Every structure is written in C-alpha cells, then in structure tokens.
A protein has these predicted regions:
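Short terminal alpha-helical segments
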Residues: 1-40
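Amphipathic alpha-helical elements of HEAT/ARM-like alpha-solenoid repeat scaffolds that form extended
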Residues: 7-14, 50-57, 109-110, 128-131
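Hydrophobic core segments within long, regular secondary-structure runs in both alpha-
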Residues: 22-33, 54, 83-95, 124, ...
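Low-complexity intrinsically disordered segments
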Residues: 90-144
C-alpha cells in the first residue's frame, strides 16, 4: 500500500483486466457510476480503480510516462474509446474519490485522511494531478 496510483491490489487487478481487454475501461466506468448512483458512496476498490483508469487515460494521450506495471496495455485502443462523455464521467468520479464536495462519499479518501499526514498530502497531490490532467485532455481534445 503506497501513495502512487498502482501501489494497491485493486489498481493492479484493474490493470490486469485492462491488459486482457482495453475496452474494459469503459465497462468499469459504467459499473462504478451505477454503484455511485445506487449507494451514493464509493468503496476503496472502486476508488482505486478510478485513479488507475485516470492514469491509463493520461498514458494513452502521452501525458504521463507509462508505469512498468502497465507496459503490456494497448494504449491505442484506450485512446480510441475515450470520448467527451467518458472524460466528463471520469472527472465526476475523480472528484468524488477526492471528496471535492466534502460530502464524505469516498472510502479511499477517508482511509488516506486517517493515514500519516505526509502520506495523505502526497496521495492528494498525485491524485489531484490526475484530475487536472484529465480536465486538460478534455479541454484540449474536445474544445469547440
């Protein structure tokens, strides 16, 4: 368990699923959105998957260097599946994971909040960088 995106089992499991089928990224986004709509809360596993998803999208657009664990993924297919709607939904989920609205609907955020303050700050910085990166891709790729 660590502060970077892929230093947890949930993100690693997500990576393996995407390796087998890059389009699973869209299915996972839909599944997580349905959970949020039903429960108005995001468990730690889904929160970790959202962060991993954001990292993979950034990788597919060449924004971040590809982490060793994700070297086998076909990023071309991921990039082809990313549309404006996908990015907007991903942004909403990232904001929920990061508790932007202060509504305490993210187990992952709560766990990091209880961690060592230095680790929490590092995790937040990494995670907010993902959010900003996704917003930038949306704005650059889908500007009117």
């Amino acid at each position: 368990w660590g502060t970077s995106v892929f230093e947890n089992d949930s993100a690693c499991d997500f990576i393996l699923n995407v390796e087998n089928s890059p389009t699973v990224i869209t299915d996972e986004l839909v599944r997580i959105r349905e959970i949020v709509e039903e429960e108005d809360y995001l468990e730690v596993d889904e929160g970790s998957s959202v962060l991993a998803m954001a990292e993979l999208v950034l990788n597919s657009f060449g924004v971040n260097p590809i982490h060793e664990i994700a070297k086998k993924i076909d990023f071309t297919l991921i990039k082809e599946t990313v549309a404006l709607t996908f990015l907007n939904q991903l942004i909403s989920l990232l904001e929920l994971v990061l508790d932007v609205d202060n509504n305490n609907r993210s187990e992952l955020f709560e766990l990091w909040e209880e961690a060592d303050p230095k680790d929490f700050a590092e995790w937040k910085n990494i995670s907010f960088d993902l959010l900003e990166g996704i917003k930038k891709i949306r704005d650059e790729q889908f500007a009117n």
